[in-house]
């Protein structure tokens, strides 16, 4: 009775098999109904994806010289061509997984029927029937196509629709690819355990060799693992792995790929695997001190349309702009001044290469180690390239100076330097005993009562710049800070109350902005220096030199165009004004400690309560801004030598931050490249130049020209000394700062002739005589020295 039942089951199974094969291998036509439609959808072959798609691989992140510093992947796979795979591996696969591989057309009908009969008679699954083609399809849908857990389960579910689809696609695959191509794709795709995907990664993992170098026993072991990579792991189950290897060797001998004597000899050999599997560290977390740059590069690419998910799958080569020699110099400089183990305080440094069409980041470091262990002074927070700390302090005075230069001030313009400054409508608080509604600031040191803008940049009196920002306007200073490089100051909620820092500073008419009281992005601050070194031209800080895909094709990166942030002459003038900082300014001592003699432009900065400090410096070949700040859970004043948290701070930008810059600069080839040539126009100021420009003009033209530039003009007639009547001989401002609305007196010739040798004036010259303007050289000789 049981024999009859088995025979009946067999006949039914064969009938079902015939129907299934007919459905999956023949086009579905004329079979209406929802069920058939669903079956057709399930079976539909995505042949283009199978034959042209790329399996996930390993993305390599390198420094500018191509040396790897990190690998990014989900599946560690290295696709190799057929000739780079040992023939023994192909033979082992065919002899063990699909002996009729070269005879069938993707679906082995004989094997299918044989397995079906065996399983029915056994009352369970005793024999499989999947060909190499079918296994490839299943693994591809699981390892490549599946985008989530649900799709992964669908790719491996035990269901008739899934099996039919698999058979249909396997048949199509055989019509499209050669047998060798199918074997190559299969061996490049499947998992071999221990995080190795594909035969090349497997050969490296277990034997530290290439797939081309595998001998019969090694190939047999790897193919044997495919039965169950977990159960047959040779590191946890060497006996099981050895037994399975020997089964594969005997299969190879049975199919004639190797001699039986060779199979027996290899079967008696030890596994020969490495003492431990050779794996590959994954992610920026393994990049050590280069981790910050690696992480920034990935964020940068994500912003440009190449997300991390794609990078993890794409087998890209990402070449960064990081220069290892400059990076090492930066690390040494930072950690020589701020210990990685010091609680609550860190120093960050980015070194940016100036340029008018690109802005490469050559180094990005923190005094902290990159990592996850807080007990080991590690962090993965984006300290070098995000808004951190309590501000760059007086470094922000360069923005006020730049705004003043734009508005016509010159480096020689004289500015008041009161001991205490009280301004209204520009915030409140500040120095002690400040009246309600006023913002008060005092100078820490003793200064001359008046000094030039150039000297003010070097000596850094607070009161001078608070009064200067009152004259230039806070909005213009904020805007120029953003244009020069502090672009994150326009990010929504960067101020913390829903507003950007830039908007809050403008809304509150923040006089303290010139003293740098807000968190700063150290990368952007370094880029400000690079912008000034590059003729006032802003370019986005760039961590990427090149990206190619696994086929070596260039990947386009949509970078923003560079912008002219300020006039090149203003940038050069500001650089000239900042050059005195290391000569007789706040960075003089630091330059002396470093024995630094090359010209640079520099500005030190310290917040009012010494909670952070910075040093911005640049030459034509290097730009950087070391930044020291509280990075713990508690913000306190900071002390110097050594840098640490303390109750009463004494840290200044001319201390460790400046020391860091000079020490790092010795490792940067372009650091001694000098400064741009400065124009004399901005030494005196464009407003002063505007006054000089009307000398020699007639009264009406001169008056109109100055009024158009915002001056209030009055006229006085003076002794002509040979100038034609009605001709301007000088222009005298009432306010040496030449602010908007300044009263200017035009001194106009009365036509008197020059003094005769007897001391008597000569007869007046006719106003009808043609007056010839002096040459620029003669005009320069005739000018009186300016007190502005």
Map each language-model feature to its residues.
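Extracytoplasmic/periplasmic proteins that interact with beta-lactams or build/remodel peptidoglycan
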Residues: 36, 48-58, 63, 127-135, ...
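Short pre-catalytic segments that frame enzyme active sites
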Residues: 67-78, 201-205, 230-234, 308-314, ...
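Residue-level preference for non-acidic, small/hydrophobic
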Residues: 66, 93, 136, 182, ...
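A penicillin-recognizing enzyme superfamily signal
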Residues: 316, 320-342, 349-351, 364-367, ...
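Peptidoglycan glycan-strand catalytic modules in the bacterial/periplasmic cell-wall system
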Residues: 55-58, 62-257, 369, 458-462, ...
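N-terminal type II signal-anchor transmembrane helix
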Residues: 1-60
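Bacterial peptidoglycan biogenesis and beta-lactam-recognition machinery
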Residues: 95-108, 122-126, 173-179, 191-196, ...
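Ligand-recognition elements built from short beta-strands and adjacent flexible loops
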Residues: 670-773, 777, 786-788
